[in-house]
């Protein structure tokens, strides 16, 4: 299985409370792009679980590849729940998300993405002024549900 390198600026952890709220509804059994440092397993080259949570790297190319893979997995009868930035003017949204999503939810406010320490504990990094800050983009939850 090939490994890919994720730029640390493109690699943030989902806040646990946000994830758990979605997990209660969808009962996730797989995350093809979990938070980690450095070299990671390429979630694009493997089959996904039956119920998947995906917070992909936000760089355009990787985000688009993960959305396309999510649509493929949906067509196999799986559920893929994405947490991605709102970008409704893009080709990605109009060609892939809008015609295939079974649900789109726009998140009020901005999510405070974080990092994980060596023990796996979530924390919010501080900016140059010593304060935590929200993400720089609005977010949406996009569901591709192939169960029906």
Label every model-predicted segment.
Residues 1-148:
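Class I S-adenosyl-L-methionine-dependent methyltransferase catalytic core
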């Amino acid at each position: 299985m090939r490994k890919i390198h994720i730029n640390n600026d493109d690699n943030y952890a989902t806040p646990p409370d946000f994830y758990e709220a979605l997990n209660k509804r969808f009962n996730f059994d797989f995350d093809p792009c979990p938070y980690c440092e450095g070299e990671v397993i390429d979630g694009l080259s493997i089959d996904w679980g039956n119920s998947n949570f995906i917070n992909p790297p936000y760089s355009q190319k990787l985000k688009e590849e993960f959305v396309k893979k999510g649509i493929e997995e949906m067509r196999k009868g799986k559920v893929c729940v994405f947490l991605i930035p709102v970008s409704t003017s893009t080709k990605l949204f109009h060609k892939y998300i809008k015609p295939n999503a079974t649900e789109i939810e726009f998140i009020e406010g901005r999510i405070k993405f974080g990092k994980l320490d060596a023990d796996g504990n979530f924390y919010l990094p501080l900016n140059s002024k010593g304060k935590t800050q929200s993400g720089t983009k609005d977010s949406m939850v996009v569901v591709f549900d192939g169960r029906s």
